[in-house]
Every structure is written in structure tokens, then in C-alpha cells.
Regions:
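Membrane-embedded helix bundles of polyisoprenyl
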Residues: 2-5, 93-103, 144, 153, ...
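Membrane-interface junctions at the ends of membrane-embedded or membrane-associated helices
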Residues: 7, 32-46, 74, 232-262, ...
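Membrane-interfacial entry segments at the cytosolic side of transmembrane helices
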Residues: 13-21, 78-88, 254-259, 297-312
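Extracytoplasmic loop-helix module adjacent to an early transmembrane segment
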Residues: 98-134, 234
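Short hydrophobic/aromatic helix or loop-helix immediately within or flanking a transmembrane segment
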Residues: 136-159
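Conserved small/polar residues in nucleotide/adenosyl-binding loops
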Residues: 321-322
């Protein structure tokens, strides 16, 4: 989305039609290309069922019963234990979401304000994107502004409304990133959620979390700090497995390693694209990962891939600012 908005802004053709087409078009083309041999049969099946429904050959109740049966067979039959496990985890996650909403959400109801003095400036910059006037006040990391502008332009939500409620939404994702990171280092199934519940408790210095009540670029970029670090850790773990794996397993493990590196590059570049302070934090985490895996990091086969990915992530973010 960020690259798409940058491209359309530079061409001065950014609007709801071009943004929607640029978002849906590539996925639709890929979907059609992959399923091009099955599409005629699917269209014929849909038209046949619609015709039978409209002609009265098949009643509405019969169609609904068949649809319900299809959904049951695909998602529920023989999966009772799986759903029980999922529901238990969803209940714990729901408690965490409720706690986050209780701590960070009252602003939406009680004050309905911006909660930070610099948000009106960001609001002005986002409004200028409506006029295809990017970087109206100089070059600045515009990742956050582009996301708000995209939501405003495509879905028709007023910018000032988004800036008043988006702070809680982005905080959900920050904590979700924390859950993912804790799942990597904790053996207990519910320990990550307990860690989130402990952190969200209102027992710390208010200055440590007050800014999360507002929609701010620096806090938004924190979503990508832990995610990029997690991908770096997973690369080292997966690459070690690849070196010891059988030949028939190496190809799949190598693809996993490449995918982790790509995600690391994207995550790290997004921190710089959104706010450079978060890049400093992510850099410190990366140094910690390098120290933790120092014996592997120092080997050329690890080092060259990590360095190439790091340079690529910086170039991706710099390219967005050039």
C-alpha cells in the first residue's frame, strides 16, 4: 500500500479509483492466472445454481441447508477438539483485548480528542495528500500518514475521525506483535497472553504508555520492531536446520529461510519508513540477536545473507523517501 500511494502521489493521480484498482487488481490477476483452468467450470456451476434458484427448481430453504452443510463439512466435522483448543485460546486473547481497550480506549468515549499536541500537524500533512501534494513541509517518513490517508480515501472515513480512534487500533497490533515475540521464547501456551495482561496492567509509570492513547507515527512503527526481530531469529534457527537436513528437506527449508529474510527486510524497512526512532530500537535488538547467535553470525554463509538483507531493507526505505 505504501509503495502504491507513493507511486500514485508522484504521478498526481492518487484517488479512490486508482487506489482501489491498484490494490485489488494485482491480487485479482494472480488469482485468475493460477485458477484460469478452473474458472469456466466455477462460473458454469454458479450460473446453473442461480438459474435453478430463480426458476423455482430449487427452493431458498434447500439452498441454505446445502450451504450450511458445506460449511459444516469443511470447517467443523471431525474438528471438535481443535475448536475447543482454539476457543480456549480465543477466550484468553479476548481478555487481553478487553484489558487493552479498558486502558487505552476511554479516550474515544470520554474525550474523543487527539491526545497529543503534534497530531494536528500530521492531520495537515495527511490532508495535503488529498491534493496529491506529498511532503508539503519537507521530506519526512510518511508511512503512517499514507496508511491513514489510504483508509480515509478508500473507505471514506474522515481523517480527523481516524486520528481520534486509530491510536487504540494500532495499539492492538503492537500488543499482537508482542504476543508473537513471546510465543517464540516462551514454552507455555498461555504465557504470552499472561505477559501481555501483566504489561497492560495500569501499574507502571503513566509516561511509559500514555502516548499509545493517540495515533502517532512513532507508536505505529513499533508494530514492526518485534516482528522484524522475530524474523531474524527464525532465520538463524531455520538455517541451522537446513545445514543438518537431508537433501529432500533442504529445498523447503531454504525457501523458509528466504521468506524469513524477506519479512525481516520488509519489517526493518517499515520502521525507517514510518519513524526513525523505532529503527534505532530495532537496530539495538538486531545487535542483540547477532550477539546471541554470534558463532553463526560470524560465519560467511550466515553473514553475507544477513548483510545483503540489511542493505536491501535500508534501500527499500530510502527509495520511498527519494
Amino acid at each position: 500500500i505504501i509503495y502504491l500511494v507513493y507511486l500514485l502521489q508522484f504521478l498526481h493521480i492518487s484517488n479512490r479509483v486508482t487506489l482501489t484498482a491498484g490494490t485489488v487488481g494485482p491480487f485479482l490477476l494472480v488469482w485468475i492466472w493460477k485458477r484460469r483452468s478452473k474458472i469456466p467450470g466455477v462460473i458454469e456451476w454458479v450460473l446453473e445454481n442461480v438459474e435453478r434458484l430463480l426458476s423455482g427448481e430449487r427452493g431458498k430453504k434447500t439452498s441454505l441447508v446445502q450451504l450450511r452443510g458445506t460449511i459444516y463439512r469443511r470447517f467443523f466435522r471431525g474438528k471438535r477438539k481443535q475448536w475447543l483448543n482454539v476457543l480456549l485460546e480465543l477466550a484468553v486473547m479476548g481478555a487481553a483485548i478487553a484489558a487493552i481497550t479498558y486502558v487505552y480506549g476511554p479516550n474515544m468515549i470520554e474525550a474523543y480528542g487527539y491526545k497529543a499536541s503534534d497530531i494536528p500537524v500530521h492531520n495537515y500533512w495527511i490532508n495535503e495528500l488529498d491534493r496529491n501534494n506529498i511532503w508539503v513541509a519537507g521530506v519526512y517518513p510518511y508511512g503512517f500518514h499514507i496508511v491513514i490517508y489510504y483508509l480515509h480515501m478508500v473507505f471514506g472515513i474522515k481523517t480527523y475521525v481516524l486520528l481520534r480512534i486509530f491510536g487504540v487500533v494500532q495499539t492492538y497490533f503492537v500488543y499482537l506483535a508482542m504476543v508473537v515475540a513471546l510465543k517464540m521464547v516462551c514454552k507455555g501456551r498461555f504465557t504470552p497472553y499472561l505477559g501481555v495482561l501483566f504489561y497492560v496492567m495500569d501499574i507502571f509509570n503513566r509516561n511509559t504508555y500514555a502516548r499509545f492513547e493517540g495515533a502517532l507515527p512513532q507508536e505505529f512503527s513499533m508494530i514492526f520492531i518485534l516482528t522484524s526481530v522475530c524474523m531474524a531469529i527464525r532465520f538463524f534457527q531455520e538455517f541451522a536446520k537446513e545445514q543438518k537436513a537431508e537433501e529432500n528437506e533442504k529445498k523447503e527449508l531454504d525457501q523458509n529461510c528466504r521468506w524469513y529474510l524477506i519479512q525481516f527486510a520488509i519489517g526493518f524497512s517499515l520502521t525507517l519508513t514510518i519513524h526513525f526512532y523505532s529503527t534505532m530500537i530495532a537496530g539495538l535488538f538486531c545487535i542483540g540477536v547477532a550477539v546471541g547467535f554470534c558463532f553463526r553470525f560470524a560465519r560467511w554463509k550466515y553473514f553475507r545473507r544477513i548483510m545483503a538483507t540489511g542493505i536491501l531493507s535500508v534501500l527499500l526505505s530510502v527509495d520511498r523517501k527519494s
